[in-house]
């Protein structure tokens, strides 16, 4: 009898849940989506774990620059902490996957993964590659680049080891290698039955200001974005949107409050076409490159 009532209760609850209407976009979100149709540019942000991504950069690119913006997390965070439950390992990876998907709903990005496993902390990329099948993870990154077709790739960490975690350094190393291989038909040719080769224009490192200052870099010559800008259409700054996104990483205790201020992020060119001040310099983000596209305006 108890089983009967339990099943009945489950059916009723599921019926109620699935009957809930989808959130209705407000007029500002609809207008933003229409404006976004005017642009074809895309950016792929790459790092190692859920919560590594700079949600302010993703928010700015997706809702400010109106570009198709993706985050490629090489792992699903199986080796992280869990401050809200008892799930660990694969179950924690499932939980953190959902947290990433919820974060993207708020900052406007798209989410991608590779088969890499978060097996815990490592000191170096060499140690990381002893556990990861480097060639398979690299093929996954190349696949995402060929399918997503980004104009620009941004890495969260440098490839030179200052990221504080072997996974972090490995993610940057693999991103730089994939940048070259994605346009090589000899690299992972089995993918070409489904996608075409693709050549992004540039790879940037989302550099840390203290690291640049330590090297006495001339910041005026490094492309930057003001992530604290206010979006009058949405009524929020991009850092406020970012806070809503980052707060979805509940298992990691990563809630944050939004602010409005000048918050500059700098982007160091790692590979690709040279640039002076604008990350998108020389890249046509309009429909002009598409046959008949000059007639398309929203």
Where are the regions a protein language model picked out?
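Short loop/turn segments at secondary-structure transitions that flank enzyme active sites
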Residues: 75-78, 159, 209-212
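Short acidic, glycine-rich surface-loop motifs adjacent to enzyme active sites
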Residues: 148-161
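Bacterial Sec-dependent N-terminal signal peptides
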Residues: 1-21
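Catalytic metal-binding/acid-base residues of hydrolase active sites
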Residues: 51, 117, 158-160, 209
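The feature marks non-catalytic terminal segments
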Residues: 21-22, 29, 181-298
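Active-site rim/loop-helix segments in enzyme catalytic domains that contact anionic ligands
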Residues: 20-147, 169, 173-180, 184, ...
